[in-house]
Amino acid sequence: MGQLISFFGEIPTILQEALNIALIAVSIIATIKGVVNVWKSGLIQLLMFVMLAGRSCSVQIGHHLELEHIILNSSSILPFTPTLCKLNKTYFLVRGPFQAHWGVDLAIGSTTVAVENATKTYTLKSKNFTGCFEGNPDPDSAALLVTWLFNSLHHDYKNDPSILCERVSGENSFRFQINISEPEYCEKILSRMANLFGSFENYCLNNRHIKKLIIIRNLTWSQQCHENHMSAMQLITSNIHTQVVRARRILSFFTWSLSDAVGNDMPGGYCLEKWMLIASQLKCFGNTAVAKCNLNHDSEFCDMLRLFDFNRKAIETLQNKTRSQLNIAINAINSLISDNLLMKNRVKELMDIPFCNYTKFWYVNHTKLNHHSLPRCWLVKNGSYLNESEFRNDWLLESDHLISEILSREYEERQGRTPLSLVDVCFWSTLFYTASIFLHLIRIPTHRHIVGEGCPKPHRLRADSTCACGLYKQKRRPLKWVRSN
């Protein structure tokens, strides 16, 4: 009795504390709801836009998903092959192999420098350049470079106009003169030069000069222009067709041995080292992203990774600058490059369509799980990279694919940790529960009642309205089926 009286005496205190709890709960709910309403009103978004306008362009696709990019260091891809560049619409340069200190220039004009049948002038009717490089300190490399160049221009020694070769005495220099005055031959040569060096003005349409010539001379290389790795790749793929069958496929022997920056095996992914990138120390991609390169050969990024890996090994072995070793390297590199992709991108450039320059690549990154999509090329148009909004559909679709891959991987991992018997038990128990719901809705009757009377339980009536114990003796009374509550 005393405890009951004490309880009633403490009720005001309990109510006061309960009221405090209610006030706190109401305050929290009101604050959260107020913040949500302010966010939905757009005021915060407006302030963020005003503060970040012109300062930030980060693209956040969704929750934990962001659009990021890497820029590959193209200068370290092919140091042992000839590299090409363009100064202007009529002047082009080609650097010798193995980062040579010499090269050749190609100048389009109308000035004649070599005359047929003159002293020290040779007419080339085959690929025999004997006499053109007398006195040159490295005649084999010079002959190889000129051979590659003429092969890339698709010059036919039998049917096309003859090429004149002149050796300048006392200067260890040489000159080649190509007459492109014939319209068809001019279009052919300049179109091939456009494939090699990139787009430039069509000199064949210049009617001010009847005679049109291309002069090729050797020179000392002093970094006159920035070498284009895409042009070097084009030079390689255009020369391989002279050695193997034209229809070919990328070799499938090149499978990824995933490693870290030091070269140790790392099953977790593949890392791009510092020398491969610009403005970044190290970038790693997971197995799922990089392993796609083993399945499909339709990615510019995969081509670049193959070249990086090949370059890392080739520098150690290709120290002897011989023609045979260089041809072996060219064959091996060509088996790693997709010439279809390369040609498509060059054609797109010539047609002023956004194309890939094999330098900048974008990918979708899941910041929480650190999963990446396979990088895709950031296209270029009119000398500048496209804005993110111009290929919005591409990275949104890539983000959907990345989320699907993450969910699929999590599902497979979860399946691997879950016993199959437990899955069966869960399935059949769920099926049983679903069936029981339908049985409950049907409301199956459980016993008989005599119409107009109460429940006869525990007696169980027969079909003739009697029971076994004799309490219900009258037969053939009306019955009905009833469900127990």
Swiss-Prot record:
Keyword Glycoprotein: yes
Keyword Metal-binding: yes
Annotated TM spans: 18-33, 425-445
Keywords (A to Z) from UniProt: Disulfide bond, Fusion of virus membrane with host endosomal membrane, Fusion of virus membrane with host membrane, Glycoprotein, Host cell membrane, Host endoplasmic reticulum, Host Golgi apparatus, Host membrane, Host-virus interaction, Lipoprotein, Membrane, Metal-binding, Myristate, Transmembrane, Transmembrane helix, Viral attachment to host cell, Viral envelope protein, Viral penetration into host cytoplasm, Virion, Virus endocytosis by host, Virus entry into host cell, Zinc
Binding-site residues, Zn(2+) 2: 447, 449, 455
GO BP: any one term: fusion of virus membrane with host endosome membrane
Protein name: Pre-glycoprotein polyprotein GP complex
Species, as recorded: Tamiami mammarenavirus (isolate Rat/United States/W 10777/1964) (TAMV)
Gene, per the UniProt record: GPC
